[in-house]
Swiss-Prot record:
Domain (Histidine kinase) ranges: 398-662
Name of the encoding gene: HK2
Entry superkingdom: Eukaryota
Function: Cytokinin receptor related to bacterial two-component regulators. Functions as a histidine kinase and transmits the stress signal to a downstream MAPK cascade.
GO process annotations (BP): cytokinin-activated signaling pathway; phosphorelay signal transduction system
Post-translational modification summary for this protein: Activation probably requires a transfer of a phosphate group between a His in the transmitter domain and an Asp of the receiver domain.
Name the UniProt record assigns to this protein: Probable histidine kinase 2
Length: 1048
C-alpha cells in the first residue's frame, strides 16, 4: 500500500510539471515566431523590391523588342530609295511597283508603302481594313485624279478595272518637306491614305536627284498593342504610352504630354496614376538602342514607376510602367500583427488554463483515491466473472454434448421404427423427425450466435429447390398452428418462386431464417393466421420471373441516410459490393411473414434484432432468433425490417430479401428435329406453373375452411382460367353443383384451348418432345368440373351425402373430386374417402407440390376422353394416390418418404463394421440401423476396447494371410467422447497398429459437437470423415461409400 502512495505522489508531481510545461512551450514558440516574422519581413521587402524592378525592366524590354517593325520599315524605305536612284528609273511606275510590293509583302505590319513624284503623281500599296486585309493599289495622276485597283496577291500586278477614289488633300509632312526641300529622310505622324482617321507613323526617304520620295506607314496602335499583348497576364501592372511629333519641322520634338498617354492593357488610366506622370522625368534613347529605365518611388507605399522614351527620327514615343503593389503585402503585414496578438492571447489563455487545471488536479487527487479503491474491487469482480464465464462455457459444452446424444437417440428410434410403421404412423414419425431437427436447430442457434459475433460463419453452397424449403418450413409451423387453431399457409402470390430453377446457397441457414420468423409469428399469435408470402425477381431480366423488386426503396433509403447522416453504416458497409447484383444467373427473393398477433410497438422495433432482447417477457425463447436472422440475411446480401401494416390491421409483418444464384442447369430449348431429351421433374413443374388460362371453361366448386386458404385457392383457380363457385356451407354443396352444371353451357367452347394449342404455346420444346408430357397432355375435353371439399373440421357424413350428386355427374361431365385433410384426419376417414370415390387427397396447408399434384390431376382429366384418370385407377385408393404423386410430384414423394433410395435395399450388404459407442441407447439404434442396411456389426463400449478388438482382428488376419494383410474391418464408426479412452486417442493407436502392416482402415468420427475445432482435431489424429449426431441412414450410406471409394 505504501508503494501505491509513493507512486501516487510521483504521479501528482508529474501532473504539475505537465501543467506548467505547455506555458513554457508557448512562451518559447512566441519568441521564435516574432524573430522569424521580423527577419522574413525584411527579407521579403528586399526581394519584392528586386522583383519589382526586374518585372518593370522585363516589361519595357518586351515592348522595345516589339518595336522592330518600325526599324524594318525605315530600312526598307531607304533601300528602295537607293535602288531607284542607282537605276535612274524614277518615273516608271512599272519599275517602282514591284520593288514597293516586295517590301510591302514581307512586312505584314506595314499599313501602306508609297512613292510620290515631284509632278504630283503617286503610287501606293495598302491593306484594306488593316492587319491581314486585302492588298490593293492606289495611284494618282499628275492632274490630281486618284484611282484604286485590286492587285494580284502573289505578284502585285494590278488586276481588274481601276475605280476612282476620293482625292487626298495633302501628303504627309515629311514627304512634302522631302519633295520641296530635299534632305536625308525623317518621320512624321499623319493619317494614312487608305485608312482615314488612323494615326500612322510615316518613315520617308528621298530618291536621289530630286525625283521623288519613298515612304512607309505603320499604324502606331497596331505595333504597340501587339507588343503589349504578352503582358496581359501580369497582375497589378499598368502600361501607358503616348506619341508626339514635330509636325515635319527640323527642331527636336517635345516630350508627350501626361494627358496624351493611353493604356496598353485595356484597363484605362486611373486618374491618380495619370496625375503622377507630370512628376516623372525620363531620358530619351534611340529606338535601336537599349531602353534607359528610370525607376521612381513616387507614392512608394502604393506604386512603383518606370519610364522610357524612344526618339524615332523626330517622333518621340513615351512609355510609362506602373506596378501597383500587391494587396498581399499589406495582408502579410497585418497578418504578422495579428499573429503576434494571437500568440499573446494564447499565452494568456494558457496561463489561465494552467491555473484552472492546477485547481482541478487537486480535486482529481481525491477522486483518484476513491476510484483506486473501486478499481481494486471491480478488478476482483472481473476475475470472478471471467472464471464463471469459463466454467459456464465448459458446462455448456458438456450439456451440448449430452443434449445432442439424447436427440440422436430420439432420431435413431424414429429412423428404426419407420420401416415397421403403417402410413398413419409414418406421418407422425415424419413430424417427430422435424421436431427433433427443430430442437437441434435451437441448440445450433446458440452456437451460431457465438460464431456470428466472432465473424466465423461461412455460408455453404449447395443446390436446393426454394419451393421445397418454403413448403417444409410452413408444414412444420402448421403442426403448431393446428394445435392453436391458427391458419398457416404459404401464399405463392404470382407463383414466381415456383417458376425458378434450383438455387445454390446455404439452405440450412436460409431455413433457419424462415423457421425463426414463422416460430415467432406462431408464438405471439393466438387467433387468425400466419402467412408466408414469396416473390422472385431476376435483377437482370431474362426469364419469365418478372415480379418487381419490393426492397429497392429500402436500399435507396439506406443510401440516403448513410450519405448525409452516416446512418445505417453497417448495412452499407456489408452490402456495398455484392457480385450477385450484376450476375445474370442471380435471383432476388423477397419474403414477407405476416401474422395477426399482438404486434410489436414502434419504440421497440429497432431493438428486436439485438441478441438476448425480447419484445415481451413471459413468452419463452432465448432472444437470439431475430439477431441471428438479421446476421444471416445480411450474409446473403439482403436486409430485413418490419413493414408497416394497413391502419386497423393487427399483427406484424417482417419483410426481407436475399440474393442467391441459380444452378444454371436449365438447358436451352432444342429443335424438334433433334429428338426428345431428358427432362427433370423440376422442369415439368416449372413449365406447368408458367401456363395461364389453360383450364378455360372449367368450373370449380370450392368449400374450404380458412379465409387465407380460400383466397389463395380462388386466386390460383381463376389464374388458370377456371370459374370458381364459393360454397358458404356444407348444406349448399348440392345446390352449388347444380348451378355450376347448368351454367357451364354458357361458356364459349371456341374460346377454350385445344390440346395442340396448349402444348405448342405454353410448354418449351424439350417438354413437348418428352414422352411423359406427350402421354399426359393428349386430346382435351374443353369443359370439366372440379369439386374441392375441406373435411378437416369434420362433418364428413354431411359431406358424403352432398357429394353423391357429384358422383352421379361423372358419367355426363369430366369431373374430379378432391378432399382437403390435415394432421388430425384419422385412418378410418381415409377409408371413407375411398368410398366417396375421392380422386385426390391433399393435406393442408395447400401449397407447392400439393398444388402441383392438383394441377396434374386436372391434366389427367384432359388427357382422357373419359372422366376416369389415365394414370390412376379407382379400384385401389392408396395405389391411386401414390402413383399420381410419384408421376407428377417426385419431389413431394421424396420428401415424405424419408427412406433411402438406392439401387439395392441393403447397400452395405456383407460389410464388416466396428461400431464404437458408449451410450447403450445409441448402440442399439445404430447397430439396428447398420444391420438393416446389410452390415455385420461388432460393438465396442469405449476406445480401449476398440483398440484391443482391432489389434486381435488384425493379428488373426495376418496369420491367415501369407502375402498381404486384409482389412480387419471395412469401416469403423468411432464416437469421439467416451470414458477411459476417447475416440481421438483410440484412432491414434489404431493408426499406429496399421503402420506395422501397411494398411489403412476408413474411420468415421461420430460426435455431438459441431465446432470447427473438433473437425480439425479429428483430421489431425487420422480420421477420414466427421459426422455430427444424430446420424441418418442416408448419411451413413453416403459416408461409407465416400470413404470406401476414396480408399479404392
Amino acid at each position: 500500500m505504501r508503494e501505491v502512495e509513493e507512486v501516487s505522489k510521483w504521479r501528482r508531481r508529474c501532473c504539475y510539471f505537465w501543467i506548467l510545461f505547455p506555458l513554457a512551450v508557448i512562451a518559447t514558440c512566441m519568441t521564435i515566431t516574432v524573430v522569424t516574422f521580423c527577419s522574413s519581413t525584411m527579407y521579403m521587402t528586399e526581394v519584392m523590391g528586386e522583383a519589382t524592378k526586374g518585372a518593370m525592366d522585363s516589361a519595357l524590354m518586351h515592348i522595345a523588342g516589339n518595336m522592330r517593325p518600325l526599324l524594318e520599315a525605315n530600312r526598307s524605305v531607304f533601300t528602295i530609295a537607293n535602288t531607284l536612284h542607282v537605276q535612274g528609273n524614277m518615273a516608271s511606275f512599272s519599275h517602282v511597283g514591284p520593288k514597293l510590293f516586295l517590301a510591302f509583302s514581307m512586312q505584314p505590319l506595314q499599313a501602306q508603302i508609297s512613292y510620290a513624284a515631284v509632278d504630283g503623281a503617286a503610287f501606293a500599296y495598302y491593306r484594306a481594313g488593316g492587319g491581314d486585309g486585302e492588298a490593293r493599289a492606289m495611284f494618282a495622276r499628275p492632274n490630281g485624279t486618284w484611282f484604286t485597283q485590286a492587285v494580284d496577291p502573289a505578284t502585285g500586278r494590278p488586276v481588274g478595272n481601276a475605280t476612282a477614289a476620293a482625292p487626298h488633300q495633302q501628303l504627309p509632312p515629311n514627304v512634302t518637306r522631302l519633295l520641296l526641300d530635299g534632305g536625308g529622310g525623317g518621320a512624321s505622324l499623319a493619317d494614312g491614305w487608305a485608312r482615314p482617321g488612323v494615326r500612322m507613323l510615316f518613315l520617308s526617304a528621298p530618291v536621289g536627284g530630286g525625283g521623288g520620295a519613298v515612304s512607309a506607314a505603320v499604324a502606331v496602335d497596331d505595333v504597340v498593342l501587339r507588343g503589349a499583348a504578352g503582358l496581359r497576364q501580369l497582375r497589378d501592372l499598368g502600361m501607358y504610352y503616348a506619341v508626339a511629333g514635330n509636325g515635319g519641322a527640323t527642331a527636336a520634338p517635345p516630350a508627350p504630354e501626361p494627358a496624351a498617354y493611353r493604356s496598353l492593357l485595356g484597363d484605362g488610366a486611373a486618374a491618380e496614376e495619370m496625375a503622377l506622370f507630370s512628376s516623372v522625368k525620363c531620358t530619351a534613347s534611340a529606338i535601336d538602342a537599349p531602353p534607359k529605365l528610370d525607376v521612381h518611388g513616387v507614392k512608394s507605399d502604393k506604386y512603383r514607376f518606370a519610364c522610357t522614351n524612344f526618339d524615332i527620327s523626330g517622333v518621340q514615343m513615351g512609355f510609362r510602367v506602373v506596378l501597383r503593389k500587391s494587396a498581399m503585402v499589406g495582408v502579410f503585414r497585418r497578418g504578422g500583427v495579428t499573429m503576434v496578438a494571437v500568440a499573446c492571447a494564447a499565452a494568456a489563455a494558457a496561463t489561465v488554463a494552467c491555473v484552472l487545471m492546477a485547481r482541478a488536479l487537486r480535486r482529481a487527487v481525491a477522486r483518484e483515491a476513491a476510484l483506486g479503491a473501486d478499481l481494486a474491487r471491480h478488478r476482483d469482480a472481473l476475475r470472478q466473472a471471467e472464471r464463471k464465464s469459463m466454467n459456464k462455457s465448459n458446462a455448456f459444452a458438456s450439456a451440448s454434448h449430452d443434449i445432442r446424444s439424447a436427440l440422436a437417440a430420439v432420431a435413431g428410434l424414429v429412423e428404426v421404427s419407420r420401416p415397421e410403421a403403417n402410413p398413419n404412423i409414418v406421418d407422425n414419425l415424419n413430424q417427430m423427425e422435424l421436431c427433433t431437427n427443430k430442437l437441434l436447430d435451437i441448440l445450433n442457434s446458440i452456437l451460431d450466435t457465438t460464431k456470428v459475433e466472432s465473424g466465423k460463419v461461412q455460408l455453404e453452397e449447395v443446390e436446393f429447390n426454394m419451393a421445397d424449403v418454403l413448403e417444409e418450413s410452413v408444414d412444420m409451423a402448421n403442426v403448431v398452428g393446428i394445435t392453436k387453431g391458427i391458419e398457416v399457409i404459404w401464399d405463392p402470390c404470382d407463383f414466381s418462386v415456383m417458376k425458378c430453377d434450383n438455387i445454390i446457397g446455404d439452405s440450412k441457414r436460409f431455413k433457419q431464417i424462415l423457421d425463426n420468423l414463422l416460430g415467432n409469428a406462431m408464438k405471439f399469435t393466438q387467433e387468425g393466421h400466419v402467412i408466408l408470402r414469396a416473390w422472385a425477381n431476376r435483377p437482370i431480366a431474362r426469364g419469365s420471373i418478372g415480379a418487381p423488386s419490393r426492397f429497392a426503396y429500402r436500399s435507396l433509403e439506406n443510401n440516403f441516410f448513410s450519405f448525409f447522416f452516416g446512418a445505417k453504416e453497417d448495412r452499407v458497409s456489408q452490402n456495398s459490393f455484392n457480385p450477385l447484383q450484376n450476375d445474370p444467373n442471380s435471383v432476388e427473393f423477397y419474403f414477407e411473414v405476416v401474422d395477426t398477433g399482438i404486434g410489436i410497438p414502434k419504440e421497440k422495433r429497432e431493438s428486436v434484432f439485438e441478441n438476448y432482447v425480447q419484445v415481451k417477457e413471459g413468452h419463452g425463447g432465448t432472444g437470439l432468433g431475430l439477431g441471428i436472422v438479421q446476421s444471416f440475411v445480411r450474409l446473403m446480401g439482403g436486409e430485413i425490417s418490419i413493414k408497416e401494416k394497413e391502419p386497423g390491421e393487427r399483427g406484424t409483418c417482417f419483410g426481407f430479401n436475399v440474393l442467391l444464384k441459380t444452378s444454371g442447369n436449365q438447358a436451352a430449348e432444342e429443335d424438334i428435329e433433334e429428338g426428345p431429351s431428358t427432362v427433370s421433374e423440376l422442369d415439368i413443374r416449372a413449365s406447368v406453373f408458367r401456363e395461364t388460362n389453360c383450364f378455360k371453361g372449367w368450373h370449380c366448386i370450392l368449400f374450404v375452411h380458412g379465409d387465407e386458404t380460400r383466397r389463395v385457392l380462388q386466386a390460383w383457380m381463376e389464374s388458370i382460367g377456371m370459374k370458381v363457385w364459393m360454397v358458404p356451407g356444407v348444406e349448399s354443396i348440392s345446390s352449388t353443383l347444380e348451378k355450376a352444371r347448368s351454367s357451364r353451357d354458357d361458356c364459349d367452347v371456341d374460346r377454350c384451348f385445344s390440346s395442340k394449342e396448349m402444348v405448342s404455346q405454353v410448354l418449351p420444346t424439350t417438354l413437348r418432345n418428352n414422352n411423359i408430357m406427350a402421354r399426359n397432355l393428349g386430346e382435351h375435353h374443353p369443359l370439366g368440373m372440379l369439386l374441392i371439399v375441406d373435411v378437416s373440421n369434420g362433418q364428413l357424413e354431411n359431406i358424403q351425402r352432398q357429394a353423391r350428386d357429384f358422383t352421379q355427374m361423372r358419367s355426363q361431365v369430366p369431373c374430379k373430386f378432391v378432399c382437403l385433410t390435415d394432421l388430425r384426419t384419422s385412418y378410418k376417414d381415409f377409408r371413407r374417402f375411398e368410398e366417396m370415390s375421392c380422386d385426390l387427397i391433399l393435406r393442408k396447408p395447400v401449397h407447392g407440390s400439393r398444388l402441383y399434384s392438383l394441377l396434374m390431376t386436372l391434366r389427367d382429366v384432359q388427357s382422357s376422353p373419359m372422366h376416369r384418370s389415365s394414370l390412376v385407377g379407382h379400384e385401389n385408393y392408396v395405389t391411386r394416390h401414390q402413383d399420381s404423386a410419384n408421376i407428377v410430384a417426385l419431389a413431394e414423394v421424396g420428401r415424405l418418404d424419408q427412406g433411402l433410395k438406392t439401387e439395392e435395399d441393403r447397400p452395405l450388404d456383407g460389410m464388416h463394421v466396428l461400431l464404437v459407442e458408449d451410450t447403450l441407447v445409441l448402440q442399439t439404434i445404430q447397430r439396428k440401423m447398420l444391420n438393416q442396411l446389410g452390415a455385420i456389426v461388432e460393438l465396442a463400449g469405449d476406445g480401449a476396447k476398440a483398440v484391443d478388438m482391432f489389434r486381435d482382428a488384425i493379428e488373426r488376419a495376418s496369420v491367415s494371410e501369407e502375402h498381404s494383410v486384409p482389412l480387419p474391418y471395412d469401416v469403423i464408426f468411432m464416437d469421439c467422447q467416451m470414458p477411459r479412452m476417447d475416440g481421438y486417442e483410440a484412432t491414434r493407436r489404431i493408426r499406429e497398429e496399421e503402420s506395422r502392416y501397411g494398411i489403412r482402415t476408413p474411420i468415421i468420427a461420430l460426435t455431438a459437437h459441431s465446432m470447427e475445432d473438433d473437425l480439425q482435431k479429428a483430421i489431425d489424429v487420422g480420421m477420414d470423415l466427421h459426422m455430427t449426431k444424430p446420424i441418418e441412414r442416408r448419411r451413413i450410406v453416403e459416408a461409407v461409400h465416400g470413404v470406401c471409394k476414396g480408399k479404392n
